[in-house]
């Protein structure tokens, strides 16, 4: 019985690390210049049409950028922007925006 509980706990712990992203926030900052027109210099958008990126979860940003890039999610502005991003670019941008303080 103890071994079954141990295996179950191990599976839960293993599954909880699925959202870990190994991006480079410094490289993400360099790449973020193209994002600032809509999402703001510090990831805080001045227009309510575009979401704030500052403080956003890395895994969420990675998933959404992949969806835009791969055509799963479409937007007239984001889809062409995301199509230029490599997997490393996406990870780096996600790390950068996750490290910024979320807006008010």
Segments the model singles out, each with a brief description of its role:
Residues 41, 70-71, 100-103:
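Generic structural signal for alpha-helix termini and adjacent loop/cap motifs
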Residues 15-32, 46-49, 62, 67, ...:
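Electrostatic cytochrome c docking/interface patches
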Residues 43-72, 79-83:
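Gly/Gly-Pro-rich "capping" loops immediately C-terminal to redox-active cysteine motifs
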Residues 2-20:
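Classic N-terminal secretory signal peptides
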Residues 35-41, 93:
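The canonical Cys-X-X-Cys-His
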Residues 8-11, 64, 83-104:
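C-terminal capping alpha-helices of c-type cytochrome domains
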Residues 27, 60, 77-80, 92:
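Extracytoplasmic/secreted proteins, especially bacterial periplasmic and envelope-associated proteins
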């Amino acid at each position: 019985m103890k071994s079954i509980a141990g295996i179950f706990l191990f599976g839960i712990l293993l599954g909880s690390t699925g959202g870990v992203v190994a991006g480079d926030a410094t490289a993400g900052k360099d790449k973020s210049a193209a994002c600032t027109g809509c999402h703001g210099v510090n990831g805080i958008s001045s227009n309510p049409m575009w979401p704030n990126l500052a403080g956003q979860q890395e895994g969420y940003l990675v998933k959404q950028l992949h969806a835009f890039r791969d055509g799963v999610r479409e937007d007239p502005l984001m889809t062409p922007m995301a199509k230029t991003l490599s997997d490393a670019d996406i990870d780096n941008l996600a790390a950068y925006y996750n490290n910024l303080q979320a807006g008010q």
